[in-house]
Structures are given as structure tokens and as C-alpha cells.
């Protein structure tokens, strides 16, 4: 014989409020991450503009390193 479990349901207004807060948090986090990525890319561009050859050489392995 199967037993049914009853779970309380949240009101739709409460669900909408939680979703709105979550979307706001996500969008703020995305904006912050986008800004951080842009800063890193700008820094890489600056390094490449001033010293591209040394930058590339730093990634080349030498003799089995």
C-alpha cells in the first residue's frame, strides 16, 4: 500500500519574490565577473603591446621542461 506524503506548497507570490531576488543576485554577479574579465584582458593587451616576444617566450618549453 503506497503512502502519500503531503508537502506544504509556497504561495506563488513568495516564489516570484525569491526568483526576482535570485535573478538580481545573478545579474550583479555577472556584471562583476564581466568587469573582472575585461580588466584581465586589458592587462594582457598592455603586456602584448609592450613586450609580446618575451610574453610568448615565457610559455615556450625548453629542452624537456
Swiss-Prot record:
There is a cross-link at residue 65 (Isoglutamyl lysine isopeptide (Glu-Lys) (interchain with K-? in acceptor proteins)). The keyword NAD does not apply. Residues 25-49 form a coiled coil. Pathway: Protein degradation; proteasomal Pup-dependent pathway. Residues 1-34 are annotated as: Disordered. Keywords: Coiled coil, Isopeptide bond, Ubl conjugation pathway. Residues 1-13 have a biased composition (Basic and acidic residues). One of its GO terms (biological process) is protein pupylation. Pfam families: Pup. Strongly interacts with the proteasome-associated ATPase ARC through a hydrophobic interface; the interacting region of Pup lies in its C-terminal half. There is one Pup binding site per ARC hexamer ring. The N-terminal unstructured half of Pup provides a signal required to initiate unfolding and degradation by the proteasome but is not needed for pupylation, while the C-terminal helical half of Pup interacts with ARC to target proteins to the proteasome. Protein modifier that is covalently attached to lysine residues of substrate proteins, thereby targeting them for proteasomal degradation. The tagging system is termed pupylation. This is Prokaryotic ubiquitin-like protein Pup. It comes from Nocardioides sp. (strain ATCC BAA-499 / JS614).
Amino acid at each position: 500500500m503506497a503512502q502519500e506524503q503531503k508537502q506544504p506548497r509556497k504561495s506563488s507570490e513568495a516564489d516570484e519574490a525569491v526568483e526576482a531576488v535570485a535573478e538580481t543576485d545573478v545579474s550583479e554577479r555577472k556584471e562583476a565577473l564581466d568587469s573582472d574579465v575585461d580588466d584581465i584582458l586589458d592587462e594582457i593587451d598592455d603586456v602584448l603591446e609592450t613586450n609580446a616576444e618575451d610574453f610568448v617566450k615565457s610559455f615556450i618549453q625548453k629542452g624537456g621542461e
